[in-house]
């Protein structure tokens, strides 16, 4: 006998190992598994471990040419999801040798690859990953990080303010640049290309870059503050993307932008490396994330996409608002905001954090709150996100009845009032509206904004909530 027996055997015989002691070098994954009727949870968890590592559907001759014990993924724990009849959390450990160094692309190709189409599973969601320090050290991470960005901008002790230029599509480059200038002159730190502004017939990228650079230099000269506009370098090829980033650097602007999910992790990591080498900050938009992360039983939670972005590289990333028009429960949002900013984050299931994560000094990422927010939200945003964040008001700036610059003034006054009140010991959560009303007395721009948006709310329950 050669020790080979053809045929199909249950995954759990090889890949379900409840006695396994995880190693410090393992990548750990928490999957929400919904097995098909009749499939035991142990078999489903083992199938996930197998199909995302060394396994296939049948025994093969070449298994004997390597050490499966060294390379296989292992399902080492399964727990039932509270309040759900047929959902389980399957914990899987992957040996580090399965993954190419410095490649988010390779990591995801294994862990969230073909296994998500596996017939024995009705649904599968990756809830969290523990990335070991040994693997993190193979990544550059964010081009600069929070402290270096503050030093570059010379801005401390408050959140940064931004605005997405609207309408997002259709403006000529010159009119677009005019809107940028008005917002920056009014007191914002940044303006932003919308995620789908690339290089369309109505506004080619080079023209936009030139007019926006002119706008921010003019605003800098008038205000004495350093200003930025997120020039979207996202393109159809990596080569074109880098060409646009090179032109931005030649113009001397401080920051460029990338749509990291539609652009892809390979392109994003290349751009992050270019940005560090050339002194550019990198703003990241998460367009397409809700396709992946919004359903509670299938896909991938945004906290995983956030960790992947910190590894791939970005200085800012959109992270929901809690109070605006886009999905995001407070505890869950603050959980992944900490994973973006902090160096060490403890396991905390009450905030959706399944594993303790040590980032071993990888630079942090500023979370960007954007989507349906306005001046009345300023106290809540300041209280929820703290100083190390970017608060981005698109319609909440450009929708001001007096124009773009007064809209920017209103936001800056509201922010300064909230920061001052907080520093004096006032409770933003309880006294927020009163603080804004007091500031209105000496800012007619803020008073006008408060009148326009006094009744705007987005009262819809979040889809992705914690298991109770």
Curated annotation (Swiss-Prot):
Binding positions (Mg(2+)): 192, 194-195
PROSITE patterns associated with the record: RUBISCO_LARGE
Gene3D superfamilies in UniProt: Ribulose bisphosphate carboxylase, large subunit, C-terminal domain, RuBisCO large subunit, N-terminal domain
Reactions mediated catalytically: 2 (2R)-3-phosphoglycerate + 2 H(+) = D-ribulose 1,5-bisphosphate + CO2 + H2O; D-ribulose 1,5-bisphosphate + O2 = 2-phosphoglycolate + (2R)-3-phosphoglycerate + 2 H(+)
Record-annotated site: Transition state stabilizer: 325
Enzyme Commission (EC) number: 4.1.1.39
GO biological process, one term: photorespiration
Gene Ontology molecular function: magnesium ion binding; monooxygenase activity; ribulose-bisphosphate carboxylase activity
Record keyword Manganese present: no
Chief place of localization: plastid
UniProt-annotated location(s): Plastid, Chloroplast
Residues modified as N6-carboxylysine: 192
A GO term from the CC aspect: chloroplast
Active site: 166 (proton acceptor), 285 (proton acceptor)
Function: RuBisCO catalyzes two reactions: the carboxylation of D-ribulose 1,5-bisphosphate, the primary event in carbon dioxide fixation, as well as the oxidative fragmentation of the pentose substrate in the photorespiration process. Both reactions occur simultaneously and in competition at the same active site.
Assembly information from the UniProt record: Heterohexadecamer of 8 large chains and 8 small chains; disulfide-linked. The disulfide link is formed within the large subunit homodimers.
Additional note from the record: The basic functional RuBisCO is composed of a large chain homodimer in a 'head-to-tail' conformation. In form I RuBisCO this homodimer is arranged in a barrel-like tetramer with the small subunits forming a tetrameric 'cap' on each end of the 'barrel'.
Protein name (Swiss-Prot/TrEMBL): Ribulose bisphosphate carboxylase large chain
Species for this entry: Solandra grandiflora
């Amino acid at each position: 006998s050669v020790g080979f027996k053809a045929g199909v055997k249950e995954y759990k015989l090889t890949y379900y190992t409840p006695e396994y002691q995880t190693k410090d070098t393992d990548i750990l994954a928490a999957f929400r598994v919904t097995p098909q009727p009749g499939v035991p949870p142990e078999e489903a968890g083992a199938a996930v471990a197998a199909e995302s590592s060394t396994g296939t559907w049948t025994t093969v001759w070449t298994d004997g040419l390597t050490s499966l014990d060294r390379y296989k993924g292992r399902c080492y724990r399964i727990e039932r999801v509270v309040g759900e009849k047929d959902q389980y959390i399957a914990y899987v450990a992957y040996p580090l040798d399965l993954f190419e160094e410095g490649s988010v692309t390779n990591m995801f190709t294994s862990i969230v690859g073909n296994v998500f189409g596996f017939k024995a599973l009705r649904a599968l969601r990756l809830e969290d990953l523990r990335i070991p320090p040994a693997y993190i050290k193979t990544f550059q991470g964010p081009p600069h990080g929070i402290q270096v960005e503050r030093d570059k901008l010379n801005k401390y002790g408050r959140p940064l303010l931004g605005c997405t230029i609207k309408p997002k599509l259709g403006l000529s480059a010159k009119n677009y640049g005019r809107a940028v200038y008005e917002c920056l002159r009014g007191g914002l730190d940044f303006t932003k290309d919308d995620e789908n502004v690339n290089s369309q017939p109505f506004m080619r990228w080079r023209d936009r870059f030139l007019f926006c650079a002119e706008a921010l230099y003019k605003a800098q000269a008038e205000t004495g503050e350093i200003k930025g506009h997120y020039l979207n370098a996202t393109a159809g090829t990596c080569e074109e993307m880098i060409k646009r980033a090179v032109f931005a650097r030649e113009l001397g602007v401080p920051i460029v932008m990338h749509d990291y999910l539609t652009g892809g992790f390979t392109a994003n990591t290349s751009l992050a490396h270019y940005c560090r080498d050339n002194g550019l900050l990198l703003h990241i938009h998460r367009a397409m994330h809700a396709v992946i992360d919004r359903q509670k039983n299938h896909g991938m939670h945004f906290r995983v996409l956030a960790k992947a972005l910190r590894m791939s590289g970005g200085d800012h990333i959109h992270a929901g608002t809690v109070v605006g028009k886009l999905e995001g429960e407070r505890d869950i949002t603050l959980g992944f905001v900490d994973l973006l900013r902090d160096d060490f984050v403890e396991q905390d299931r009450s905030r959706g954090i399944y594993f303790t994560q040590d980032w071993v000094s990888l630079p942090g990422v500023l979370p960007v709150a954007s989507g349906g927010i306005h001046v009345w939200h300023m106290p809540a945003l300041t209280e929820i996100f703290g100083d190390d964040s970017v608060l981005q008001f698109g319609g909440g700036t450009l929708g001001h009845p007096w124009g773009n610059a007064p809209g920017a003034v209103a936001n800056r006054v509201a922010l300064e009032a909230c920061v001052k009140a907080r520093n004096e010991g006032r409770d933003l959560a309880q006294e927020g509206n009163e603080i804004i009303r007091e500031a209105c007395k000496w800012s007619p721009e803020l008073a006008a904004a408060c009148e326009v948006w006094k009744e705007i709310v987005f009262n819809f329950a979040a889809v992705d909530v914690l298991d109770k």
